[in-house]
Amino acid sequence: MEEGTGEYTKRVVVHALEDILHQELRVLDKGFVRVVDYMGSDESVVQAARVSYGRGTKRTSQDAALIGYLMRHAHTSPFEMCEIKLHVKLPIFVARQWVRHRTASINEYSARYSVLDREFYIPDEKQIAEQSTNNAQGRGTPLPADAAKRIMELFRRNSELMYEDYEALLEQGLARELARMNLTINCYTQWYWKVNLHNLLRFLALRSGAGAQYEIREYASRILEIVRLWVPMVHAAFVEYHLESSTISRSALVVVRKMLQGEKVSMEESGLGRREWGELMSVLYPDGEPE
C-alpha cells in the first residue's frame, strides 16, 4: 500500500472522524479548523485505564461507565493516550490567547519567511459591543446598529491601510521580519496544533465558557463538535462532569446544606464574597432567584 491511500491499516479508525478528515470546518468570517490526523478512540482510553491488551469489555455501557468514572475523578493519563492534529486558520489576536495553553505542539505560518495574505477578521454587527460593566476582560451590551457599522468600517479601513503599508515596505526591499511589525492583529495566521485529549479537554473547558472571548469560543465550539465525532463517550462524560456541571467551595456547600434543611441564608450570613454568592445563586437558580 502507498502511504496516505487509506486503503489498509491496523490502527484504531473512527469512521465518523474519517468522514471529515481534511475538510475545512468554517469558523468566523474567514477562519477554519481542519482535522489532519488523530490517534486513538474511546477504546484507547478504556484500554489504558485497564492496562490490558484488547478492546476492553464487550458492553459499551460498561466502557461508558468507566470513562465517566475517570472523568468524574479527574484521572488524566488514560485521556493522554489519544492525540489529534489540527490545521487552524485564525486571527492573530485569537492565536495569542490560544497559546496560553502551553501543553501542545505548534508550528505556525512564519511572516519572517513568507508574506501574510490580505485577510482580516472583521466582527459582525452584533459582536460590536461596549465594555462590560462587570467583567474587565469582556464585552457588554451591543452598540446601536449605526454605531456598529461605523466601527466595522473603521476596522476595515485601518486594516487595509496597514496592509498597503506592509506591501509598500516589502516592495522597498525591507526585510519581511520588519515589514510585518505594522500589521494589525486581526490579520489571519495559520498553524498546525497537535495536542493530547486530556489537554484538549482542558482547553475546551476554559475556552468554551461564557467568560471566554466570543472569537475563541467559536473555535472551541467547532473543536467540541470534532471531539464528539472522535470520542463520543469521552465527549458525553466531559459535558456531564465538566462543561455543564459546577464546582463549589466548602463554604458554598455549607450554604446549600442549610438551604436543603429549610433555612434562609443571606449573602451577609453566608461568609461568601459578592461574586461567589452570585455564582452560587446562578447555579442554584438559573432562571433567577425566587421571591
UniProtKB/Swiss-Prot annotation:
Cofactor stoichiometry and binding remark: Binds 4 FAD per tetramer. Each FAD binding site is formed by three monomers.
* Keywords of the record: FAD, Flavoprotein, Methyltransferase, NADP, Nucleotide biosynthesis, Transferase
* Reactions catalysed, as given in the entry: dUMP + (6R)-5,10-methylene-5,6,7,8-tetrahydrofolate + NADPH + H(+) = dTMP + (6S)-5,6,7,8-tetrahydrofolate + NADP(+)
Gene3D superfamilies (alphabetical): 3.30.1360.170
Q: Does the keyword Methyltransferase apply?
A: yes
Motif ThyX motif boundaries: 100-110
Q: What is its EC number?
A: 2.1.1.148
Please list the residues that make up the active site.
R207 (involved in ionization of n3 of dump, leading to its activation)
Q: Where is the ThyX domain?
A: 31-241
Q: Which cofactor does it need?
A: FAD
Which CDD domains does its entry note? ThyX (cd20175)
Detail which positions bind FAD.
S77, R100, H101, R102, E108, N196, L197, H198
Query: What GO molecular function annotations does the UniProt record carry, in alphabetical order?
Result: flavin adenine dinucleotide binding; NADPH binding; thymidylate synthase (FAD) activity; thymidylate synthase activity
Asked whether the UniProt record includes Methyltransferase among its keywords, one would answer yes
* Top EC group: transferase
Q: Which InterPro entries match?
A: Thymidylate_synthase_ThyX, Thymidylate_synthase_ThyX_sf
The residues forming a coiled coil are none
Query: Looking at the Swiss-Prot or TrEMBL record, what is one Pfam family this protein matches?
Result: Thy1
* Biological process terms in GO annotation: dTMP biosynthetic process; dTTP biosynthetic process; methylation
User: What job does this protein perform?
Assistant: Catalyzes the reductive methylation of 2'-deoxyuridine-5'-monophosphate (dUMP) to 2'-deoxythymidine-5'-monophosphate (dTMP) while utilizing 5,10-methylenetetrahydrofolate (mTHF) as the methyl donor, and NADPH and FADH(2) as the reductant.
Family to which the UniProt record says this protein belongs: Belongs to the thymidylate synthase ThyX family.
NCBIfam families found in the cross-reference section: thyX
- Provide the assembly information: Homotetramer.
Q: Which PANTHER family match?
A: FLAVIN-DEPENDENT THYMIDYLATE SYNTHASE
Q: Can you say what this protein is called?
A: Flavin-dependent thymidylate synthase
Protein's organism = Anaplasma marginale (strain St. Maries)
Q: What is the lineage of its organism?
A: Bacteria, Pseudomonadati, Pseudomonadota, Alphaproteobacteria, Rickettsiales
Gene name of the record = thyX
